[in-house]
């Protein structure tokens, strides 16, 4: 019979080819491409192995050695492995994925969720940002009062501010390229493209930020380059530390992204319905809004029920026998 040539493609060869194809076909962005290559580097112990020789035991051994990675990193590694093995099956290099019967491993690391600022922390931070010269404080304030993502704020041009209709047009975001340069992309999803309404205070504040300028980026760094969220995060964190803003007794970590959560949390606390919040935040799906803010919604479910209860009692809609009898009409 005919002799079938054995496929000796290594894990690295196929993985790299797959990622290169994705970026060439515009399936992924430059920043995602860069991250995927970083993830691939972490799988170096499997890199030179031929795909057909990688076993489930190899994968288990790899993960056992790396349970100190953050959960998000383990998820990314698992995802990339899965994609490569799926591709290898499609190409007929292997008949079954060694990952098939394995679940995502659980990290040893405690995941510190990014949390919102409390009302007290927010008031303290606001006071500091309003009265001190803090780098990128304008970007922090816009995030605090619109809930926009950091990358969306950094990508704003002056002409994206519509003072006639008091809104900000969101249609792009920044990310980092392979050489650490800042790339401006369209927003990640359709839902990301939106109009964010602003109040008169914020409109006046933005007019101040713009000054005499007529176009170009709304915010730039000291060397006139676009700002990265990493830069803002650095100064945000510094400010919290320097002015002792963070309540250390609370769980969860505070980052620049906390300002988006803070805005959303204040919205829920003041009774904004989930569907409206989804639109403001630019979430593709209501489930994202509900999952990210479920604990805040739950807390306010009780408060809303109390309000309903009060309203009913006020209008004599009460369970149990009443003092006054309703007269039966014959």
What spans do the regions from the language model cover?
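C-terminal secondary-structure termini that scaffold catalytic or DNA-interacting sites
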Residues: 165, 176-178, 184-193, 200-202, ...
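Catalytic-site neighborhood detector that most strongly recognizes the C-terminal catalytic loop/helix
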Residues: 108, 116, 174, 281-307
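Short, basic (Lys/Arg/His-rich) helix/loop patches that form interaction surfaces
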Residues: 71, 127-136, 146, 196, ...
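Short, polar N-cap/turn motifs at the start of nucleic acid-interacting alpha helices
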Residues: 160-167, 272-294
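Basic, Lys/Arg- and aromatic-enriched nucleic-acid-binding interface segment
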Residues: 75, 90, 94-156, 164, ...
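Basic, Lys/Arg-rich DNA-contacting stretches centered on the C-terminal catalytic core
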Residues: 107-109, 133, 151, 165-197, ...
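Basic/aromatic DNA-contact patch characteristic of tyrosine site-specific recombinases
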Residues: 1-9, 13-17, 25, 61, ...
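N-terminal core-binding DNA-recognition domain of tyrosine site-specific recombinases/integrases
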Residues: 7, 16-93, 111, 225-231, ...
């Amino acid at each position: 019979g005919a002799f079938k040539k054995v496929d000796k493609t290594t894990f690295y060869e196929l993985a790299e080819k797959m990622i290169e194809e994705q970026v060439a076909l515009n399936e992924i962005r430059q920043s995602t491409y860069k991250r995927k290559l970083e993830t691939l580097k972490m799988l170096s112990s499997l890199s030179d192995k031929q795909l057909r020789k990688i076993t489930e035991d190899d994968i288990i051994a790899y993960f056992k050695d790396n349970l100190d990675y953050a959960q998000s990193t383990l998820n990314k590694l698992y995802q990339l492995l899965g994609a490569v093995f799926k591709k290898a099956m499609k190409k007929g290099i292997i008949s079954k994925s060694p990952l098939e019967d394995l679940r995502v491993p659980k990290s040893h690391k405690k995941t510190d969720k990014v949390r919102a600022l409390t009302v007290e922390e927010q008031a303290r931070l606001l006071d500091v940002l309003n009265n001190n010269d803090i780098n990128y404080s304008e970007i922090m304030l816009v995030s605090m009062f619109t809930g926009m993502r950091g990358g969306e704020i950094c990508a704003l041009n002056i002409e994206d501010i519509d003072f006639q209709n008091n809104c900000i047009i969101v249609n792009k975001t920044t990310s980092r390229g392979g050489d650490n340069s800042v790339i401006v992309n369209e927003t990640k999803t359709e839902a990301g493209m939106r109009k964010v309404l602003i109040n008169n205070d914020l409109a006046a504040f933005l007019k101040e930020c713009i000054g005499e300028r007529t176009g170009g980026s709304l915010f730039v760094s000291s060397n006139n380059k676009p700002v990265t969220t990493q830069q803002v995060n650095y100064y945000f964190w510094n400010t919290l530390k320097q002015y002792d803003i963070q309540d250390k007794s609370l769980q969860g970590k505070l980052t620049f992204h906390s300002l988006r959560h803070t805005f959303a949390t204040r919205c829920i606390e003041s009774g904004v319905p989930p569907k409206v919040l989804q639109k403001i935040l630019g979430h593709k799906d209501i489930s994202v809004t509900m999952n990210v803010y479920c604990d805040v919604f739950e807390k306010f479910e009780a408060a809303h029920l109390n309000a309903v209860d009060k309203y009913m009692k006020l209008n004599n809609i009460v369970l149990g026998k009443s003092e006054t009898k309703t007269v039966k009409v014959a």
